[in-house]
């Protein structure tokens, strides 16, 4: 994998491009022949889509990045990083973790990848804690309801 020193932070993915900017990127891809357009044009379009606030755009961005990953071994490092961000934004945290773990495996000293890995792991942990809290609340409500029903029948 190539060693490029700059990758955007996760927070950068939340500064969405406006629809005109995304359309310019899309037109660039179409002008170059769509699926046969340059990897760079498709990559730029995919990153613009991932940054979108629209889930369908984000999903298309992830699909394009997946295609580029398969097609271009030279862009795999970048694709793993951006795929992690795309899946994170879509709430697909286990998939994001797979991508970032693969990147960190190849580049264990990459500080940006390590920071992204921490963010993904923290999100997975917080989602797990929320799930446990919801289950606990459900059990407590169920137990209270059963207790009230039993108490009501004793009267």
Curated annotation (Swiss-Prot):
Organism name: Kluyveromyces lactis (strain ATCC 8585 / CBS 2359 / DSM 70799 / NBRC 1267 / NRRL Y-1140 / WM37)
Main location group: mitochondrion
Domain notes: The C-terminus is required for mitochondrial localization, while the N-terminus is necessary for mitochondrial fission.
Subcellular location: Mitochondrion outer membrane
Function: Has a role in mitochondrial fission. Has a role in outer membrane fission but not matrix separation.
Domain of life: Eukaryota
Single GO biological process annotation from the record: autophagy of mitochondrion
Pfam families per UniProt: Fis1_TPR_C, Fis1_TPR_N
Protein keywords: Membrane, Mitochondrion, Mitochondrion outer membrane, Repeat, TPR repeat, Transmembrane, Transmembrane helix
TPR repeat residue intervals: 77-110
Protein's UniProt name: Mitochondrial fission 1 protein
Side Mitochondrial intermembrane, residues: 151-155
GO cellular component: mitochondrial outer membrane; peroxisomal membrane
Family that this chain belongs to: Belongs to the FIS1 family.
């Amino acid at each position: 994998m190539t060693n490029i020193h700059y990758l955007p932070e996760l927070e950068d993915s939340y500064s969405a491009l406006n629809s005109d900017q995304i359309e310019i990127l899309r037109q660039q891809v179409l002008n170059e022949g769509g699926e046969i357009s340059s990897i760079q044009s498709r990559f730029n379009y995919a990153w613009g889509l991932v940054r979108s606030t629209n889930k369908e755009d984000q999903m298309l961005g992830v699909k394009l990045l997946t295609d580029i990953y398969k097609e271009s071994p030279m862009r795999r490092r970048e694709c793993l990083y951006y795929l992690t961000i795309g899946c994170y934004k879509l709430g697909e945290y286990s998939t994001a973790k797979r991508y970032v773990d693969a990147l960190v495996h190849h580049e264990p000293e990459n500080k940006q990848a390590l920071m992204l890995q921490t963010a993904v792991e923290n999100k997975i942990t917080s989602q797990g804690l929320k799930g446990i809290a919801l289950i606990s609340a459900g059990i407590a409500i169920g137990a209270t309801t059963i207790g009230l029903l039993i108490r009501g029948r004793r009267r």
